[in-house]
């Protein structure tokens, strides 16, 4: 889940009285502003989004198939990579079909139910990615810092339990946030200043009290953002310390190469999120929010397969074995 650091935007405001609300019509659909302020770039944006979405689906599906059907890739690192690829597919597929359709038809409305569904699946996949990146950092820590005990530390049962816990924990957390969103009333306006439905802009449109939602957002920020980030930093602190103790340059390079791909993905993901969502109130920008949304929902799922496979001989060998056209 992306860090909901825009919770600082949810400021106290005067809510309509029940009598006033009785004379208002509740919103049944929302308008996604998207990139409508730049209609001259519509064809260009559609082409770019279609290319990136196709690349994200193709890359992640190939990784999923390669790991699933190759027994040599059933190690913990690849098991977690399989889960990450699945999350990437869900994350980008929850928003890109609607975004592409809006660019083609210029029809940017989304039903209330569709918005809530999009919110649920996007938040579920994105929050699961944050937790999984932390789990993958621990896996690299175990492999580099405790190589002799790696097989016992990262047993099949333990890895399966971690992956299941990530999916279930994020599903429950997302259900809570979505449930709290469903209890709110939306009386208008109904324009979401983004190209997909997300929590903070929706809260700003609500004509109900959003206090409980705000509290839950702060708690989610603390866990998904701060705690996970610190745990990842701690894991890499131990990893770097262990690598520096290796006497030969070749040994240090080999040790670092086993975690360089994951470190690249972690830096890319957190940079995109922190860029837009950790900032003072006066520094908030809808443009920054849209850019960050593109980075972690479109660009990241597209680049992840490339980052994890370009320097991974095992994955490339599995792809060549599974798909003959890769041999050339």
Curated annotation (Swiss-Prot):
It is a multi-pass membrane protein. GO terms for molecular function: G protein-coupled receptor activity; odorant binding; olfactory receptor activity. SUPFAM superfamilies: Family A G protein-coupled receptor-like. Residues 1-43, 94-117, 179-215, 277-289 are extracellular. It is found in: Cell membrane. Disulfide bonds join 115-207. It holds the Pfam family 7tm_4. InterPro entries: GPCR_Rhodpsn, GPCR_Rhodpsn_7TM, Olfact_rcpt, Olfactory_GPCR. The keyword DNA repair does not apply. The chain crosses the membrane at residues 44-64, 73-93, 118-138, 158-178, 216-235, 256-276, 290-310. PROSITE patterns: G_PROTEIN_RECEP_F1_1 (PS00237), G_PROTEIN_RECEP_F1_2 (PS50262). Keywords: Cell membrane, Disulfide bond, G-protein coupled receptor, Glycoprotein, Membrane, Olfaction, Receptor, Sensory transduction, Transducer, Transmembrane, Transmembrane helix. Residues 65-72, 139-157, 236-255, 311-328 are cytoplasmic. Glycans are attached at residue 23. One of its GO terms (cellular component) is plasma membrane. Signal peptide: none annotated. Belongs to the G-protein coupled receptor 1 family. Odorant receptor. This is Olfactory receptor 13A1. It comes from Homo sapiens.
């Amino acid at each position: 889940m992306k860090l909901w650091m825009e919770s600082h935007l949810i400021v106290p405001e005067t809510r309509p009285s029940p009598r006033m609300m009785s004379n208002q019509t509740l919103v049944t659909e929302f308008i996604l502003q998207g990139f409508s302020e730049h209609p001259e770039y519509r064809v260009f944006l559609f082409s770019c989004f279609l290319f990136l979405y196709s690349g994200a689906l193709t890359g992640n599906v190939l990784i999923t198939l390669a790991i699933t059907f190759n027994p040599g890739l059933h190690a913990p690192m690849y098991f977690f990579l399989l889960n990450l690829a699945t999350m990437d597919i869900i994350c980008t597929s929850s928003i890109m079909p609607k975004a592409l359709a809006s660019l083609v038809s210029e029809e940017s409305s989304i039903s209330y139910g569709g918005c809530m569904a999009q919110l649920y699946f996007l938040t579920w996949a994105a929050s699961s990615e944050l937790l999984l990146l932390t789990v993958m950092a621990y896996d690299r820590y175990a492999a580099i810092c405790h190589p002799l005990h790696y097989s016992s530390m990262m047993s099949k049962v333990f890895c399966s339990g971690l992956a299941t816990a990530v999916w279930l924990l994020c599903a429950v957390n997302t259900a809570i946030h979505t449930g709290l969103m469903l209890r709110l009333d939306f009386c208008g306006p109904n324009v979401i200043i983004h190209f997909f439905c997300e929590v903070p802009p929706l809260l700003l449109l609500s004509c109900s009290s959003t206090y409980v939602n705000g509290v839950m957002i702060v708690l989610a920020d603390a866990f998904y953002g701060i705690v996970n980030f610190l745990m990842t930093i701690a894991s890499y602190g131990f990893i770097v310390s262990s690598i520096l103790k290796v006497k030969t340059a070749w040994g240090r390079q080999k040790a670092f190469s086993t975690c360089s791909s994951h470190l690249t993905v972690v830096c890319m993901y957190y940079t995109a999120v922190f860029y837009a969502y950790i900032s003072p109130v006066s520094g908030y920008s809808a443009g920054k929010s849209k850019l960050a949304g593109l980075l972690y929902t479109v660009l990241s799922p597209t680049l992840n397969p490339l980052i994890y496979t370009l320097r991974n001989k095992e994955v490339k060998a599995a792809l060549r074995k599974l798909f003959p056209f890769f041999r050339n």
